Amino acid sequence: MASGGALSPVEEKPTVVKTTKAEQHEEEAAVAVKSAAEMMKKSSPCCPRCNSIKTKFCYYNNYSMAQPRYFCRECRRYWTQGGSLRNVPVGGGCRKSKRSSASSASASAASPPAPAVGAAPPVVPALSSAISKLLQSEPMAAPCADFPNVLPTFVSTGFELPAAAGDRLSLGSFGAFGNLSAAVAAPGGGGGSSTTTSFMDMLRGVGGLFDGVGNSHQMGGNGGGGGSYYAPLITGAGNGMLMPPPPLPPFSGSLMQHGMQGLFANHAMGGGGGGVMNAGEDGSVMAGLGGGQWPPALGGADEQQGGGDGGEAVMTKDTGGGASSSASRPDYFYGWNSAAGGVVAGGGIGGNAAAATGATPWQGLIDSSSAMM
């Protein structure tokens, strides 16, 4: 022992961290891969097929850095480094093929030619024949079926309808007035004459509404002369008349039927003396007919007096005056012309205050028909 009892210090050994072999191999592999990748990127390998240097790196096959894949621009083929070469023809990597072009050419040849733009489609013969028959067929005649609805329009337009291109259409253009032109062009004789075409002339040509008419404005001779069924109401003016009721169409509702009866049957249109159906000079209403004949007895106690009463019924005698004036008549009991008389002129010479008013012709008829609609 050394003297003095001093102890020597213990020397400490440095600790060395030992790594496992697996870790060492991993580090080495990573360094090798990095170096190989850098070399591949820096230098392009030659193509194993054509030995061309025009190659490029594409990607890693199967995401493995040990299998880089290249592409040769010269022969247009791919290869993988370290793998086997496939027997791929030149240009095998190109997706353009002759099969697609051939199929497109055959499809274009097989497609039918497009129709011309201006060519019209073929017309079916059956359809064309049906259309021609429909155009040639005449409409069914229904005279005065819509008379209350059509009359105000005809009156407001002067009994004419406007058409395109500035033309005027008369009532003869419609199917319900088919025989209109013949009736107006060839009026009958007897009782009087007129050079103008009136609305009653037009109505005479419609489906037998005024059959047996003598000629325009006057229907028969003086006082029932000429054997006409519809005798004139006055002597001298020659344009008063009694409108007979036409066959009523099947309207629904009693208001329309009552209006049609009141429009055509219940009252007379006239301007002066002379009986409605004269059998002589007494001027009674139903003197020439007897009982049970058409037209039936007109309504009202003062309108149903028999023959021989002196003609003081609807129209008074030629020398009478004012017995049946407008005091008990509705608006549509009127004279044919406003100048010939107002609502009802009581006699050929007499007349009352209503005759001097000069009411507009057809105004009352228009008001009544409008009220029925």
From Swiss-Prot:
List where in the cell it is found: Nucleus
Question: Which residue stretches are annotated zinc finger (Dof-type)?
Answer: 45-99
Q: Which domain of life is it from?
A: Eukaryota
Q: Where does Zn(2+) bind?
A: C47, C50, C72, C75
Q: Bias category Basic and acidic residues: which stretches?
A: 10-23
Location of the region described as Disordered in the Swiss-Prot/TrEMBL record: 1-23, 297-327
What is known about its subunit structure? Interacts with RISBZ1/BZIP58.
Please give the start and end residues of each transmembrane region: none
Listed Pfam families: Zn_ribbon_Dof (PF02701)
Write the protein's name. Answer: Dof zinc finger protein 3
Its cellular-component GO annotations read: nucleus
Show the GO MF annotations: DNA binding; DNA-binding transcription factor activity; zinc ion binding
Could you read off the lineage of the organism from its UniProt record? Answer: Eukaryota, Viridiplantae, Streptophyta, Embryophyta, Tracheophyta
**In the UniProt record, what gene is named as encoding this protein?**
DOF3
Keywords (A to Z) from UniProt: DNA-binding, Germination, Metal-binding, Nucleus, Transcription, Transcription regulation, Zinc, Zinc-finger
